[in-house]
């Protein structure tokens, strides 16, 4: 009885692997990538440039654009883009249209993102959440909507970089909220544009060493957040809480942050070049073995584990 089931599962796995490895012919199609100053965006831009794609890379800063242009081929073009500014997005869309012309846009990679303040929710303000949502959620939505006509023209692909923290909210702050929102947008977009030949993939990296996970930056923002708290709130948590929280954060980041960014860029490249791109990619050992399995566990169990890991406030009653 079990043998036919086992053979059937094995056959399915082999067929899936064969299908997953089918690639499109070599292409010089246009791909637009946001957030190419550093990290995943910069690495992907250079990889695609080497493969012959015509890369249109957007950077937030002039120095980021200049550094990228210096090491890339003449096929790669850069522009400045602030994805939180609707006028900047429209200007970038016109710039892309000027380059692609009748060919259309084959690929859009929404990569730009920020961490914001990672810390206890009661420490934060509405503006703290809004700033992160503007970059990580509303930014990609605005860029995607502005470029949809060009993507439809080429029957192109949208790749949105979210996070495993868009599947499991492991900490407070706007980051998890923003990534959950981008996941939902991507799922609904995928179904809505499939009729027009546009494919949508989500890449959910685990923890990697990028500017978003820079410990010095994360610690500075949380210390500034603590300093602005009312004395009563500081008393609830106690002076030792911040020190314990930062030490815990440092231990976790040093343990699980992967320095190999190519694990992510390879997934992004596959989503652009595979004949049958996956709906979701989860690069990183921690994503596959820790965060995604945990997202399917009962919420009460996940709550218990995370509550045990995080330090307790001085005046905790539970």
From Swiss-Prot:
The chain crosses the membrane at residues 1-21, 289-309. Optimum pH is 7.5-8.0 for 9-cis retinol dehydrogenase activity. GO terms for cellular component: cell body; endoplasmic reticulum lumen; endoplasmic reticulum membrane; intracellular membrane-bounded organelle. Residues 22-288 are lumenal. It is found in: Endoplasmic reticulum membrane. It is a multi-pass membrane protein. The keyword ATP-binding does not apply. GO terms for molecular function: 11-cis-retinol dehydrogenase; all-trans-retinol dehydrogenase (NAD+) activity; androstan-3-alpha,17-beta-diol dehydrogenase (NAD+) activity; androsterone dehydrogenase [NAD(P)+] activity; protein homodimerization activity. One of its GO terms (biological process) is visual perception. Glycans are attached at residue 160. It catalyses: 11-cis-retinol + NAD(+) = 11-cis-retinal + NADH + H(+); 9-cis-retinol + NAD(+) = 9-cis-retinal + NADH + H(+); 13-cis-retinol + NAD(+) = 13-cis-retinal + NADH + H(+); androsterone + NAD(+) = 5alpha-androstan-3,17-dione + NADH + H(+). Pathway: Cofactor metabolism; retinol metabolism. Keywords: Disease variant, Endoplasmic reticulum, Glycoprotein, Lipid metabolism, Membrane, NAD, Oxidoreductase, Sensory transduction, Steroid metabolism, Transmembrane, Transmembrane helix, Vision. Changing residue 128 to N: In FALBI; decreased stability. It is an enzyme of class 1 (oxidoreductase). Its main location: endoplasmic reticulum. Substrate binds at residue 163. Homodimer. The last 8 amino acids of the C-terminal tail are important for a proper localization as well as for the in vivo enzymatic activity. Catalyzes the oxidation of cis-isomers of retinol, including 11-cis-, 9-cis-, and 13-cis-retinol in an NAD-dependent manner. Has no activity towards all-trans retinal. Plays a significant role in 11-cis retinol oxidation in the retinal pigment epithelium cells (RPE). Also recognizes steroids (androsterone, androstanediol) as its substrates. It is linked to Fundus albipunctatus: A form of fleck retina disease characterized by discrete uniform white dots over the entire fundus with greatest density in the mid-periphery and no macular involvement. Night blindness occurs. Inheritance can be autosomal dominant or autosomal recessive. This is Retinol dehydrogenase 5. The lineage of its organism: Eukaryota, Metazoa, Chordata, Craniata, Vertebrata.
């Amino acid at each position: 009885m079990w043998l036919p089931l086992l053979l059937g599962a094995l056959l399915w796995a082999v067929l899936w692997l064969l299908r997953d490895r089918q690639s499109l012919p070599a292409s010089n199609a246009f791909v637009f990538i946001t957030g190419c100053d550093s990290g995943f965006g910069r690495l992907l831009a250079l990889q695609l440039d080497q493969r012959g794609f015509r890369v249109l890379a957007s950077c937030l800063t002039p120095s980021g654009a200049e550094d990228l242009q210096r090491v890339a081929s003449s096929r790669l073009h850069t522009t400045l883009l602030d994805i939180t500014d609707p006028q900047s997005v429209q200007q970038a869309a016109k710039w892309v249209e000027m380059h692609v012309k009748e060919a259309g846009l084959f690929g859009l990679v929404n990569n730009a993102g920020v961490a914001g303040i990672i810390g206890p929710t009661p420490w934060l303000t509405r503006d703290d959440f809004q700033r992160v949502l503007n970059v990580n959620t509303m930014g990609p939505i605005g860029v995607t909507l502005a470029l949809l006509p060009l993507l439809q023209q080429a029957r192109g692909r949208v790749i949105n970089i979210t996070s495993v923290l868009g599947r499991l909210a492991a900490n407070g702050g706007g980051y998890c909220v923003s990534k959950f929102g981008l996941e939902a947008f991507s799922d609904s977009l995928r179904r809505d544009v499939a009729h027009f030949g546009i494919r949508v993939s989500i890449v959910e990296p685990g923890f990697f060493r990028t500017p978003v996970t820079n410990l010095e930056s994360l610690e500075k923002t949380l210390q500034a957040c603590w300093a602005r708290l009312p004395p009563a709130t500081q008393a609830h948590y106690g002076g030792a809480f911040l020190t314990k929280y930062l030490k815990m954060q440092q231990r976790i980041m040093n343990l699980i942050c992967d320095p190999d960014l190519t694990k992510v860029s390879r997934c992004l490249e596959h989503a652009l070049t595979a004949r049958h791109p996956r709906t979701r990619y989860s690069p990183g050992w921690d994503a596959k073995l820790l965060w995604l399995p945990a997202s399917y566990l009962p919420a009460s169990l996940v709550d218990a584990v995370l509550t045990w890991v995080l330090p307790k406030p001085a005046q905790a009653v539970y």
